[in-house]
From Swiss-Prot:
HAMAP family found in the cross-reference section: KdsB
GO terms, biological process: CMP-keto-3-deoxy-D-manno-octulosonic acid biosynthetic process; lipopolysaccharide biosynthetic process
Location within or outside the cell: Cytoplasm
Keyword terms: Cytoplasm, Lipopolysaccharide biosynthesis, Nucleotidyltransferase, Transferase
The species this protein was found in: Nitrosococcus oceani (strain ATCC 19707 / BCRC 17464 / JCM 30415 / NCIMB 11848 / C-107)
Protein name, per record: 3-deoxy-manno-octulosonate cytidylyltransferase
Pathway(s) per entry: Nucleotide-sugar biosynthesis; CMP-3-deoxy-D-manno-octulosonate biosynthesis; CMP-3-deoxy-D-manno-octulosonate from 3-deoxy-D-manno-octulosonate and CTP: step 1/1; Bacterial outer membrane biogenesis; lipopolysaccharide biosynthesis
Length: 259
């Protein structure tokens, strides 16, 4: 199917400054993400940034760059400007691949695009994977999602949701809940160009500000986000220095196994 990938990238990450250009196995992390997007079969892959250092490195590797405003407070707003600059037709499917997901399987990019196409009432399509341990469930850097019976998002949170009161009570020894499946949100989104053009007009929501999760703006204003279970489980992205070292080790292992 036909879709385009836009990778928003900013240099000034608070926890890992210069994150898109940090070295992973001899190349900037952002270029690993670009390569994954290219392997997905997207008809076009471009990077949207406000930083000339990122622009220079990406262009030197033959990748299209869209320079955007330094005023954007979210990756989605950056994508919205890129879509406006490119003047894509309204029904064009745009995939937002986060610049800190260097190990994202290309098949998941295609899955998100296909999921949006098959759910015409959804404003956004995204993916999730099961959470299998307490460390992930209680990690605020890992975003959790609760879905309704049709797979549409009810809420995203950095907290463990839903709160299994009986299982998490101290008297039970904080046992793992057996009556509910927990899901981790995977950091990519599929939109139609028409929705991205409307998105900047939505006021920032208090939920979005509280959780620092821009997808909550859509839910707050009545939008619908379909969340499919990913066909394969990707490693978490890079949010911290510990994540960076973990990904470096995974890449070393992959290279060793390949040889």
């Amino acid at each position: 199917m036909s879709y385009k990938v836009i990778i928003p990238a900013r240099y000034g990450a608070s926890r890992l400054p210069g994150k898109p250009l940090l070295d992973l196995a001899g190349k900037p992390m952002l270029l690993h993400v670009v390569e994954k997007a290219q392997k997905s079969g997207a008809e076009e892959v471009l990077v949207a940034t406000d930083d000339r250092r990122i622009e220079a490195i990406v262009q030197n590797h033959g990748v299209q760059v869209c320079m955007t405003s330094v005023q954007h407070d979210s990756g989605t707003n950056r994508l919205a400007e890129a879509v406006t600059q490119k003047d894509y037709p309204d029904q064009t499917i745009i995939i937002n691949v986060q610049g800190d997901e260097p190990l994202l399987p290309p098949s998941l990019i295609t899955q998100a695009a296909e999921d949006l196409k098959t759910h015409p009432k959804a404003d956004i399509a995204t993916l999730c994977v099961p959470i299998a341990n307490r460390e992930e469930l209680f990690d605020p850097n890992i975003v959790k999602v609760v879905r309704d019976i049709q797979g549409y998002a009810l809420y995203f949170s950095r907290a463990p949701i839903p709160w299994a009161r009986e299982d998490f009570a101290a008297k039970t020894g904080n046992r793992w809940p057996t009556s509910w499946s927990y899901y981790r949100h995977v950091g990519l989104y599929a939109y139609r160009a028409s929705f991205l053009r409307r998105y900047p007009q939505l006021p920032v929501s208090p939920l979005e500000q509280a959780e620092c999760l821009e997808q909550l703006r859509v839910l707050y204003h009545g939008g619908r986000i379909h969340v499919a279970i990913a066909g394969t489980i990707p490693p978490p992205g890079v949010d911290t220095l510990a994540d960076l070292e973990r990904v470096r080790q995974l890449l070393v292992t992959q290279e060793r196994n390949h040889n």
